[in-house]
């Protein structure tokens, strides 16, 4: 919503500014709107707005230039005309200039040689330079600066952009776009494996859930990103080397002799760009075990190995008509649940019960929409009626759908009202989103969730949980429901479900068997070692073209299927 409203609001303010300057004598108000619009764009979107506000910048510049022109005498001022032409040209070429300034790759926590000009001139500099030109014109109109000041400012920015063009042409013709610098830096670092990720900034949790366990492998590795927008947040959150490789050519430059294995945590479209390097071992981890289509996507056949939590993940492919070779699977458990505390007291014996409500997002397609937020109010009121405290932990991507975001806002309002009346310390919003899922799972006595990976994670605790069936086919399609209380999509049985969830809990014994089926039969002590050992084995294996004989899966400590 914020991404959509930003340019719309900026365009509206810019048009208003232009109308005022052309149709009224309120020049000060118009120029004030110019400055307010630029300041608002910077405040809301930082310095990463290159190309997003071309329309508003063009209108703002035109309005400021018109305000300046109205103060000029009737004769032609050639300095002003040239300056105006240059300024409007620079703004209209923001996207093209940004592409010239965009390096072939970016790195953080990895030593590379950077040319001095590229350290100074990048997409941020171009964006700020264009904003500065608009501010200069507005200031000149306010204090009646001579036109040669505008011309000098425009020429200065033009010289900077000309240097960018020359540097870009030289780099492309003589230095392979600078990709040789990346290869040399990686050869010096000698990574043994990569974590490859193609995703948007609001999905970085997919990386961070695996990062602690990859760090425990005690091997040199690099996080390879494909989406430019994700570079800054990921690079700021880890001390590990991070490389942005937006193109196929930059990926090719990242394949170095020390590299033996690549791990993946989603079904990103650009995974195929690096999977084609057959001398490497490619392992799909995914970002959770669930009944969503991502967990049985046929595209996973392109990977050499599929690390899965338990037998349920293997059977899921066959149950959904996906023919996946069994020798690709390796059962390694779900290391993220190693800190989940197993229940020791029946829920009926707990007086002040806390329930975690974890609705998922709407997904990108109809068949992946399992979101229960439309019936969330009914669920909350049944929990309130039984004196439960609620933790509402929504999916990080809930706000990507405006209707889901509105439902979530309504639920948060209901929680706030009940907290004010009852004194129960409900948790929602940023507070509930902080930390890891395991932290809230340990705090809760029961859970209500939609179809998502949080079910498998919570299953480890052996605590009672309910699952929403928004599409009406859950019981027959999903084995996890054997250990869950199922809420119908119309919420017609929610009262009965909550009674079982917080009362007798007749599915307690069944739930323990389902836990093994989904999360593997590994001892609680050292549970994550199954994954760590399997990952080390893959990393330590020689490259495929160096193999003298086929890899023996029987030597793996994790379960091979």
What is the predicted role of each segment?
Residues 406-456:
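Donor nucleotide-activated moiety binding/catalytic core segment of transferases
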Residues 72, 194-337:
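Active-site and donor-binding regions of nucleotide-sugar-utilizing enzymes
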Residues 2-75, 79-252, 548-561:
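N-terminal pre-catalytic "stem/leader" segment of glycosyltransferase-like enzymes
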Residues 502-561:
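C-terminal amphipathic helix plus adjacent low-complexity
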Residues 201-217, 338-414, 520-529, 551, ...:
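Conserved catalytic-core segment of nucleotide-activated headgroup transferases in glycan assembly
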Residues 154-177, 302-371:
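A nucleotide-sugar donor-handling region in carbohydrate enzymes
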Residues 453-519:
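Catalytic binding pocket for nucleotide-activated donors in carbohydrate/polymer assembly enzymes
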Residues 241-250, 330-333, 425-432, 483-503:
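Short acidic-hydrophobic, aromatic-tinged amphipathic segments that line or gate anion-handling sites
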């Amino acid at each position: 919503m914020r991404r959509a409203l930003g340019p719309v609001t900026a365009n509206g303010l810019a048009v208003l500014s232009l109308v005022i300057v052309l149709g009224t004598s309120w020049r000060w108000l118009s120029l004030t709107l110019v400055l307010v619009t630029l300041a608002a764009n910077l405040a809301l979107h930082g310095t990463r707005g290159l190309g997003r506000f071309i329309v508003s910048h063009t209108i703002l510049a035109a309005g400021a230039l018109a305000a300046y022109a109205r103060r000029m005498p009737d004769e032609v001022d050639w300095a002003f005309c040239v300056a105006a032409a240059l300024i409007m040209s620079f703004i209209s070429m923001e996207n093209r200039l940004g592409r010239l300034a965009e390096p072939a790759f970016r790195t953080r926590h990895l030593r590379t040689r950077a040319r001095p000009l590229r350290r100074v001139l990048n997409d941020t500099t171009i964006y700020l330079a264009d904003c500065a030109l608009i501010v200069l014109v507005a200031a000149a109109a306010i204090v009646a600066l001579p036109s040669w000041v505008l011309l000098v400012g425009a020429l200065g920015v033009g010289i900077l952009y000309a240097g960018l063009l020359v540097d870009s042409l030289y780099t492309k013709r003589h230095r392979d776009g600078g990709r040789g610098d990346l290869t040399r830096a990686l050869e010096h670092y000698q990574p043994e494996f990569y974590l490859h990720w193609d995703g948007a900034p609001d999905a970085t949790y997919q990386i961070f859930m695996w990062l602690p366990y990859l760090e425990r492998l005690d091997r040199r590795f690099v996080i390879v990103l494909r989406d430019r927008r994700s570079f800054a947040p990921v690079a700021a959150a880890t001390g590990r080397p991070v490389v942005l490789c937006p193109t196929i050519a930059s990926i090719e430059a990242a394949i170095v002799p020390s590299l033996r294995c690549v791990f993946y945590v989603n079904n990103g479209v650009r995974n195929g760009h690096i999977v084609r390097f057959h001398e490497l071992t490619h392992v799909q981890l995914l970002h959770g075990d669930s009944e969503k289509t991502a967990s049985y996507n046929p595209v996973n056949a392109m990977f050499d190995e599929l690390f899965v939590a338990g037998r349920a993940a293997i059977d899921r492919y066959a149950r959904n008509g996906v023919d996946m070779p069994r020798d690709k699977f390796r059962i390694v458990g779900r290391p993220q649940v190693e800190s989940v505390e197993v229940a020791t007291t029946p829920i009926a014996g707990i007086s002040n019960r806390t329930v975690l409500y974890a609705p998922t997002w709407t997904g990108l397609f109809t068949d992946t929409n399992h979101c229960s937020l439309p019936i969330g109010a009914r669920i909350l009121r049944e929990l309130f009626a039984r004196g439960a405290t609620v933790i509402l932990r929504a999916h990080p991507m809930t706000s990507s759908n405006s209707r889901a975001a509105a439902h979530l806002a309504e639920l948060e309002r209901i929680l706030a009202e009940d907290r004010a009346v009852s004194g129960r310390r409900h948790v929602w919003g940023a507070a509930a989103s902080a930390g890891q899922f395991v932290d809230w799972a340990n705090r809760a006595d029961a859970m209500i969730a939609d179809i998502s990976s949080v079910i498998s994670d919570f299953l480890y605790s052996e605590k009672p949980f309910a699952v929403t069936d928004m599409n009406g086919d859950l019981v027959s399609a999903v084995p996890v429901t054997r250990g869950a209380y199922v809420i119908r999509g119309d919420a017609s049985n929610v009262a009965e479900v909550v009674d079982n969830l917080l009362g007798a809990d007749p599915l307690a014994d069944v739930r323990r068997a389902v836990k093994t089926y989904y999360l593997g039969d590994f001892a609680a002590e050292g549970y994550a070692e199954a994954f760590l050992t399997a990952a080390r084995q893959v990393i330590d294996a020689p490259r495929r073209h160096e193999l003298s004989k086929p890899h023996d899966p029987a030597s793996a400590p994790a379960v091979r299927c």
